Amino acid sequence: MGTTAPGPICLLDLCDQKLLDFVCNVDNKDFMWLKEIEEEAERMFIREFSNEPELMPKTPSQKNRRKKRRVSNIQDENRDPVRKRLSRRKSRSSQVGTRHLRSKPVTIVEENGFPVLQRITRATAAAAAAAAAASVASASSSSTAGSPTVLTKKAVVEISTSERLSAELQLTKLKGSLPPSPVSQGTLTSEEELTPKKSEAGKLDSVTVNSLKATPQSPKNRGVGEGRSVSKLKIARASWGLQDSPGSTDSPWQERVLSPILLNNILPTTAKSPLGNIRSVRRSLISQDSQVPLASKYNLVAKQENGSRRSSRRIAKKAGKEPEASARIICHSYLERLLNVEVPQNVGLEQEPVEVAEPEEAEEEQEVSKNSGCPSKPRSATKIAISTPTSKPAAAGQTTTVEEQEAELDQTDGHREPPQSVRRKRSYKQAISEPDEEQLEDEELQPCQNKTPSPPCPANKVVRPLRTFLHTVQKNQMLMTPTLASRSSVMKSFIKRNTPLRVDPKCSFVEKERQRLESLRRKEEAEQRRRQKVEEDKRRRLEEVKLKREERLRKVLQARERVEQMKEEKKKQIEQKFAQIDEKTEKAKEERLAEKAKKKATAKKMEEVEARRKQEEEARRLRWLQQEEEERRHQEMLQRKKEEEQERRKAAEARRLAEQREQERRREQERREQERREQERREQERKEQERREQEQERLRAKREMQEREKALRLQKERLQKELEEKKRKEEQQRLAEQQLQEEQAKKAKEVAAARKVLNMTVDVQSPVCTSYQMTPQGPKSIPKISVDDYGMDLNSDDSTDDESHPRKPIPSWAKGTQLSQAIVHQYYHPPNILELFGSILPLDLEDIFKKRKTRYHKRTSSAVWNSPPLKATMVPSSGD
């Protein structure tokens, strides 16, 4: 690059300006986030874990609000906020561009041509933000200097005693396997630094894992454990040479541009692009796989990129086996999940075989998951154990070993979580199960002396908490505010804290300790089994979700292919239709030309035919006129003949009608005479019948009168006999009473004379009540018998009389000749019902009862109806 060229100089000035803007942005925005994270980490270090978690009130409105806001807070920056589905509102070109922006890490090609990947970490970002304000002036001055400088200052990072001891022990183990290399500087990098991206990448700095603490897991649940475990970054002293690094240059541009953002003049391995720095520090903790759309897995470009990544991984594995002078402390499991690439490590095969094998298995599992199209969703976060300058050193008389200190540090770091604003809002089951598992994993590493034994308690009063209670507590813990999330994110196991220990005063301390350890071991085994079961269920659910998403995406892609095929077919059909239309137009033109020629020939023929037709028409018209004249004369002659014939017929008809009228008149006269004679005869018969009936009536009345007189006479005689009988009985009764009174008086005198006692009460039994009737009945009323009333008012409760022997007399008008005459007269002279009663309106039950019921308009009787109702809506039913 020529220094005198104006274009590159302007480009360098533009880069300087952009970089200064980025530094100001980091100072004003990102630094505030880093300060908040640092304060949260300090609170996590110094907080007291024995306090009870503060629970938020759970109201129905809050529950509903939480359910509605389950959308992840961490969304892709390049994603359209309106876009909701993969198959809508995005063309294929925009999707490809978006996929590259999401999945492609930021690379910058240096002057030597090596593409190197670098991302900002928490430590680097915090250091750069802290030194940004102080180094702006030096950056402007160094940009004009233009002389290459070599940065040799070192960054001093204080570490705790346990970390220093573990790092020294690890370095002593690695001295035999690693070749000597100049130690220039110790630095702390995140998992994302120095990851090989393409196959043509040059030599990269190797990585040494000094201390990688992991909970022992079985191969069965190792995949889940790696996806959910919390990584720990231990600080060790590693060195790397600036002069030997392929990415380092001594150009004046690098000195001028990179100096403002370096902490204590530490030159990073590669320059960072502005696009990579725009991403927030909190977003650096989120997996890139979760932001890559699923559609990228089914495209050919994504498959080619996966192949190139696998080849770069193989090259990185080979390069990782070569010894290098510099080393980094990187948590491989989190780095591989975050970047989806292999990270080479420089650990000897003979040292720490288990720790080296686990990342390789994770790499294989990750490759399988990539090939299957199901990206994992790690929830782990990088944990950096950095001691503050005010932290106290460990006591000289410390009795715990280095391993116990590291275990305690792991337990403390294991409870750290990103702020609640960064964490993705989880569902109900995830909020219950995930914190419980992470808490139990951390509690397994806690020492036993932290447990405070509960007071002795009978076994029947021990409360065995259910699993739902722990889940409820963990769910409430996840629903707290961001300020309380750090204090309440850790909870002691309810079983470990509250389960009482059996205290036997007869046993020794050793026996008690052994029993306690045995019970603790059994509880840990039970918790481990439960945790494994929960992890298995979670893995199965994740697999089901992945399969559903793949199936849905496959259907979407198939639908797109079908739509494209339909478009192609429609396009072909349109082209064929246009071709057919063109052919039809050509044929129509040819046909029109032929038709014109044919019309000309036919026109001449038609003119000739028309001339001949006119001549023939004139001849036919003349013949028709002649024939019409002849026909008219013939019709006139026929009409005259017809009129004469009609006149003759009319005269004959008149004579015949006169004869018929005369005959009818004679017949009518004879009929009237016969009717008169018949009427006279009937009148005579009627009079004779009336006379006979009157005679019979007179005789019957006379007979009835005689019968009544006889009945009255018999009744009088009966009454007279009854009166005589009554008088006779009364006389007998009176005589009996007198005789009885005389006897009683005689007896009373005899008793008084015999006893000579005064004031005696005598009971006299008088037979008067039975001797005669106390209230004699009066004369019975004689019923009045009338000829015309049929005795309707007498004994109305009697049953029907026998027709052959009726008890009551039948009136004369209801029997005999009077009844037959009345029937004959009514038959020949029927009464006019309309004149007598008027027009009878049909009954309407609604008017009668002042109600409306549906059954009024229905026939509900069981009768056989042979005719339809006259008025269906008005005729009442007989069943009502």
From Swiss-Prot:
<feature type="modified residue" description="Phosphoserine">
    <location>
        <position position="245"/>
    </location>
</feature>
<keyword id="KW-0597">Phosphoprotein</keyword>
<feature type="region of interest" description="SAH">
    <location>
        <begin position="506"/>
        <end position="733"/>
    </location>
</feature>
<feature type="compositionally biased region" description="Acidic residues">
    <location>
        <begin position="434"/>
        <end position="445"/>
    </location>
</feature>
<keyword id="KW-0963">Cytoplasm</keyword>
<keyword id="KW-0206">Cytoskeleton</keyword>
<dbReference type="InterPro" id="IPR022006">
    <property type="entry name" value="INCENP_N"/>
</dbReference>
<dbReference type="GO" id="GO:0140677">
    <property type="term" value="F:molecular function activator activity"/>
</dbReference>
<dbReference type="GO" id="GO:1902425">
    <property type="term" value="P:positive regulation of attachment of mitotic spindle microtubules to kinetochore"/>
</dbReference>
<dbReference type="GO" id="GO:0007059">
    <property type="term" value="P:chromosome segregation"/>
</dbReference>
<feature type="glycosylation site" description="N-linked (GlcNAc...) asparagine">
    <location>
        <position position="450"/>
    </location>
</feature>
<feature type="modified residue" description="Phosphoserine">
    <location>
        <position position="259"/>
    </location>
</feature>
<dbReference type="GO" id="GO:0005874">
    <property type="term" value="C:microtubule"/>
</dbReference>
<feature type="modified residue" description="Phosphoserine">
    <location>
        <position position="799"/>
    </location>
</feature>
<dbReference type="GO" id="GO:0032991">
    <property type="term" value="C:protein-containing complex"/>
</dbReference>
<feature type="region of interest" description="Disordered">
    <location>
        <begin position="775"/>
        <end position="813"/>
    </location>
</feature>
<feature type="modified residue" description="Phosphoserine">
    <location>
        <position position="862"/>
    </location>
</feature>
<feature type="coiled-coil region">
    <location>
        <begin position="506"/>
        <end position="759"/>
    </location>
</feature>
<dbReference type="GO" id="GO:0030496">
    <property type="term" value="C:midbody"/>
</dbReference>
<dbReference type="GO" id="GO:0000775">
    <property type="term" value="C:chromosome, centromeric region"/>
</dbReference>
<feature type="compositionally biased region" description="Polar residues">
    <location>
        <begin position="385"/>
        <end position="402"/>
    </location>
</feature>
<feature type="modified residue" description="Phosphoserine">
    <location>
        <position position="72"/>
    </location>
</feature>
<feature type="modified residue" description="Phosphoserine">
    <location>
        <position position="290"/>
    </location>
</feature>
<dbReference type="GO" id="GO:0051256">
    <property type="term" value="P:mitotic spindle midzone assembly"/>
</dbReference>
<keyword id="KW-0137">Centromere</keyword>
<feature type="modified residue" description="Phosphothreonine">
    <location>
        <position position="149"/>
    </location>
</feature>
<dbReference type="GO" id="GO:0007052">
    <property type="term" value="P:mitotic spindle organization"/>
</dbReference>
<feature type="modified residue" description="Phosphothreonine">
    <location>
        <position position="452"/>
    </location>
</feature>
<feature type="region of interest" description="Disordered">
    <location>
        <begin position="629"/>
        <end position="713"/>
    </location>
</feature>
<feature type="compositionally biased region" description="Basic and acidic residues">
    <location>
        <begin position="563"/>
        <end position="596"/>
    </location>
</feature>
<feature type="compositionally biased region" description="Basic and acidic residues">
    <location>
        <begin position="630"/>
        <end position="713"/>
    </location>
</feature>
<dbReference type="GO" id="GO:1901970">
    <property type="term" value="P:positive regulation of mitotic sister chromatid separation"/>
</dbReference>
<keyword id="KW-0539">Nucleus</keyword>
<dbReference type="Pfam" id="PF12178">
    <property type="entry name" value="INCENP_N"/>
</dbReference>
<feature type="region of interest" description="Disordered">
    <location>
        <begin position="303"/>
        <end position="322"/>
    </location>
</feature>
<keyword id="KW-0159">Chromosome partition</keyword>
<dbReference type="GO" id="GO:0000795">
    <property type="term" value="C:synaptonemal complex"/>
</dbReference>
<feature type="compositionally biased region" description="Basic and acidic residues">
    <location>
        <begin position="194"/>
        <end position="203"/>
    </location>
</feature>
<feature type="modified residue" description="Phosphoserine">
    <location>
        <position position="248"/>
    </location>
</feature>
<feature type="modified residue" description="Phosphoserine">
    <location>
        <position position="147"/>
    </location>
</feature>
<feature type="modified residue" description="Phosphothreonine">
    <location>
        <position position="215"/>
    </location>
</feature>
<dbReference type="GO" id="GO:0015630">
    <property type="term" value="C:microtubule cytoskeleton"/>
</dbReference>
